[in-house]
């Protein structure tokens, strides 16, 4: 028979698991944080039940507590005194019921009506309260050195890229060019260095001017950049998508140009998603205007460089009058029509043939032979040319007849 987990038996007996095993911190099985910080799980719309009322309803008193202590010894857990009753807001039973609800893991953000609120100890709370005072001073110095202006500063929760996908707080600074993410621990370190520097500066007037070189070490260390500083530049940012409101948080996803998606959440009152979207659109509009101006300037430079190239076509016009003497060979072609009158007398030969025939009748008696002989000698050569004309004339005469 499989033994039930120790945490479940402790819950059945009504004891919070103060020591021993620790459940994984995702999705909603956290019972104790690192450093034994108490974790408060609060269900939306649920009224916190005081610890005294819960013990009365369950009907468990000190007898159950003693049996729980003996059970701890039997289950090989460390024997320890039962602590005092926790504050009324620490409802472990209600929180675990919320964690075991069906569909808790099916939601997109891994939560279903329950929120994890870490309550650090008193010493950590003091440091946490001093974080905002030290953060902007260091961030302002860093931005002034780079020439950027901080438009908004605050704390965002970023989903980690690991297997557990925990929400981690990041000190965020929104500028005109992107979003800076700084871990809070680094700001605490910078704040401690600043406090040491201030203390040394206060001690200097009492000790005298003999130790002016000692504070140089912390001063230089305070100006050192953090080890892990992530910048989400607007040039690599594509859109701000998947805006969802659940409870008091606003969830949104920053989609980068590479296809990477980074999940954030913040209180709804802060409106980080709207500010990031607005600054991203303004940045891209400025870049588009600069691109248009640069193209126009390039075109103007090209137009200014073209006028010196204009005198080049002018010498091309000068060789144009050179082809004018070309018409001079035309008069040489004029003597070509001169041989044309030569064939004219040849063409006249066929024409006189019809004429001598009517006249040959009256003159045929006195001079029948001497005239036809001189004409018959040249006729054999042009006869091929004259035959078509003769036939045409005969046909015309026949038609006229």
Curated annotation (Swiss-Prot):
- Superkingdom of the source species: Eukaryota
Biological process, per Gene Ontology:
apoptotic process; positive regulation of apoptotic process
Q: Which GO terms describe its molecular function?
A: phosphatidylinositol phosphate binding
Provide ranges: composition bias, Pro residues.
Answer: 308-344
Location, primary (coarse class): cytoplasm
Q: What induces it?
A: Induced by homocysteine and other endoplasmic reticulum stress-inducing reagents. Induced by phorbol ester (TPA)/ionomycin, and stimulation of the T-cell receptor (TCR) complex in T-cells.
Q: Where is this region: 14 X 2 AA repeats of P-H?
A: 352-389
Bias (Basic residues) occurs at 352-378
Q: Residue ranges of the PH domain? A: 151-283
Q: Region 15 X 2 AA repeats of P-Q: start and end of each range?
A: 311-346
Q: Where in the cell is it found?
A: Cytoplasm; Cytoplasmic vesicle; Nucleus, Nucleolus
The organs and tissues expressing this protein are described as: Widely expressed with highest levels in pancreas. Strongly expressed by benign melanocytic nevi, and progressively reduced expressed in primary and metastatic melanomas (at protein level).
Q: Where is the composition biased (Low complexity)?
A: 190-204
InterPro entries (alphabetical): PH-like_dom_sf, PH_domain, PHLA1/2/3
The segment annotated Disordered runs over: 39-67, 190-222, 293-401
Keyword Cytoplasm set for record = yes
What cellular-component terms does GO give this entry? cytoplasmic vesicle; cytosol; nucleolus; nucleoplasm; nucleus
Which keywords fit this entry according to its UniProt record?
Answer: Apoptosis, Cytoplasm, Cytoplasmic vesicle, Nucleus, Repeat
Does the record bear Transferase in its keywords? no
Q: What role is this protein assigned?
A: Seems to be involved in regulation of apoptosis. May be involved in detachment-mediated programmed cell death. May mediate apoptosis during neuronal development. May be involved in regulation of anti-apoptotic effects of IGF1. May be involved in translational regulation.
Question: Subunit details for this protein?
Answer: Interacts with RPL14, EIF3S7 and PABPC4.
For this entry, the protein name equals Pleckstrin homology-like domain family A member 1
Q: Which gene encodes it?
A: PHLDA1
């Amino acid at each position: 028979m499989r033994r039930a987990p120790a945490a479940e038996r402790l819950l059945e007996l009504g004891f919070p698991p103060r020591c021993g095993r620790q459940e994984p911190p995702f999705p909603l099985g956290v019972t104790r944080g690192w450093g034994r910080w108490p974790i408060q799980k609060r269900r939306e719309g649920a009224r916190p039940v005081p610890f005294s009322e819960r013990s009365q309803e369950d009907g468990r008193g000190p007898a159950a507590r003693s049996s729980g202590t003996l059970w701890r010894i039997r289950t090989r857990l460390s024997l320890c005194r039962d602590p005092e009753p926790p504050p009324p807001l620490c409802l472990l039973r209600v929180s675990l019921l919320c964690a075991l609800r069906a569909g808790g893991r099916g939601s997109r953000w891994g939560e279903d009506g329950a929120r994890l609120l870490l309550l650090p100890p008193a010493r950590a709370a003091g440091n946490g309260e001093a974080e905002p005072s030290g953060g902007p001073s260091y961030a302002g110095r860093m931005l002034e050195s780079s020439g950027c202006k901080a438009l908004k500063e605050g704390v965002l929760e970023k989903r980690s890229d690991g297997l557990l996908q925990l929400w981690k707080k990041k000190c965020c600074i929104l500028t005109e060019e992107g979003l800076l993410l700084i871990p809070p621990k680094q700001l605490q370190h910078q704040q401690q260095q600043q406090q040491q520097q201030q203390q040394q500066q206060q001690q200097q007037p009492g000790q005298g001017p003999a130790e002016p070189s000692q504070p140089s070490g912390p001063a230089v260390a305070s100006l050192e950049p953090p080890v892990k500083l992530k910048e989400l530049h607007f040039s690599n940012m594509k859109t701000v998508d998947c805006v969802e409101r659940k409870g008091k948080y606003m969830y949104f996803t920053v989609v980068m140009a590479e296809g990477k998606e980074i999940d954030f959440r913040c209180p709804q009152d802060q409106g980080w998603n709207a500010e990031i979207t607005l600054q991203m659109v303004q940045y891209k509009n400025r870049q588009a205007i600069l691109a248009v101006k640069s193209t126009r300037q390039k075109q103007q430079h090209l137009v200014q460089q073209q006028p010196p190239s204009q005198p080049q076509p002018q010498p091309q016009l000068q060789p144009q009058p050179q082809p004018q003497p070309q018409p001079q060979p035309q008069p040489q072609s004029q003597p070509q029509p001169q041989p044309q009158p030569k064939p004219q007398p040849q063409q006249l030969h066929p024409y006189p043939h019809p004429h001598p025939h009517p006249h040959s009748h009256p003159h045929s008696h006195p001079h029948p032979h001497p005239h036809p002989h001189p004409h018959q000698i040249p006729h054999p050569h042009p006869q091929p040319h004259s035959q078509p004309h003769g036939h045409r004339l005969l046909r015309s005469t026949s038609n006229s007849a």
